[in-house]
């Protein structure tokens, strides 16, 4: 986790740099967006710390851009900053900053509703894991956050669970036939998306660039065709998990790649290279 540790704190440092310079920035015509930009920055910092405190527990806390070693802080101190940052975002990002109607093009941005969702999620985690309320934050605040999201009327479940993913939305489709696969896909920024983390497709096998490393780790070996992409073939599905799905449960085919049922195991590349993969991946 050394690389993750460094990358997380590099992100925190960048956020701290911007936050520390807020009063010296010549906002001019962008002054109306000042709260939005700073709210997004502070939400990113909160999200970074939320990940780190769950990964490592006691960690050094930096809320300013300094080059020094600091002792570990208690999780309660980390969460105090998390909630403070998210509350700032809730108070300063206008509800119409990034309209849901334009989500397909701006769904990497952080909205007020994304900050509210993270606020409620952090509250649930803290009370569930530590068995007490975080100092200065109440259940009423967390409830108000999610109720505001609901009241906005911009979010809802998609009609079919499988449509959340291109590969699952069309059922068994010709490998590489993206027109069919995207035919029923709910799309980027769909009605279920409150906060989207954007990735590029430029990741390589050495961990470089900014792509989705998760895909590199778990993607099927030897297959380059969309929608699966090539990977290391890790995290194959436990058969016991597969058997938990009852007959006719459509969530199974939406969640698990069936190498035989989807025709993957009969592809020449698969037969010639890695035909020892498990039935489900």
Locate each region found by the language model.
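Conserved, well-structured interaction surfaces
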Residues: 1-56, 66-80, 86-101, 281
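Amphipathic alpha-helical protein-interaction segments enriched in hydrophobic
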Residues: 107-118
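Elongated scaffold/linker segments in the mid-to-C-terminal portions of large proteins
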Residues: 1-7, 67, 157-281
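Structural register within alpha-helical repeat arrays
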Residues: 38, 45, 119-121, 126
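Proline-centered turn/helix-capping motifs that create local helix->coil transitions or kinks
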Residues: 52-60, 154-159, 203
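Short coil/turn linking the two alpha-helices of tandem helical-hairpin repeats
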Residues: 53-55, 60, 97, 122-134
């Amino acid at each position: 986790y050394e690389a993750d540790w460094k990358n997380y704190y590099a992100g925190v440092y960048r956020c701290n740099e911007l936050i520390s310079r807020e009063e010296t920035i010549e906002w001019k015509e962008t002054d109306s967006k000042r709260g939005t930009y700073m709210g997004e920055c502070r939400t990113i910092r909160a999200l970074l710390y939320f990940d780190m405190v769950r990964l490592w527990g006691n960690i050094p806390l930096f809320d300013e851009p300094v080059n020094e070693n600091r002792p570990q802080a208690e999780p309660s101190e980390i969460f105090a900053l998390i909630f403070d940052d998210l509350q700032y975002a809730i108070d300063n990002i206008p509800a119409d900053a990034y309209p849901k109607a334009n989500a397909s093009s701006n769904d990497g941005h952080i909205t007020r509703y994304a900050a509210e969702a993270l606020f409620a999620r952090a509250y649930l985690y803290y009370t569930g894991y530590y068995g007490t309320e975080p100092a200065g934050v109440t259940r009423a605040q967390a409830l108000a956050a999610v109720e505001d999201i609901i009241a906005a009327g911009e979010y809802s479940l998609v009609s079919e669970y499988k449509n959340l993913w291109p590969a699952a939305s069309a059922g068994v489709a010709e490998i590489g036939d993206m027109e069919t696969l995207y035919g029923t896909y709910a799309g980027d920024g769909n009605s279920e998306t409150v906060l989207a983390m954007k990735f590029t497709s430029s990741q390589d096998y050495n961990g470089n660039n900014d792509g989705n490393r998760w895909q590199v780790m778990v993607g099927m070996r030897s297959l380059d065709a969309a929608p699966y992409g090539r990977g290391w073939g890790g995290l194959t599905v436990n058969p016991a998990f597969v058997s938990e799905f009852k007959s006719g449960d459509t969530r199974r085919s939406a969640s698990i790649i069936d190498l035989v049922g989807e025709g993957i195991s009969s592809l020449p590349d698969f037969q010639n290279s890695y035909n020892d993969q498990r039935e489900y991946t």
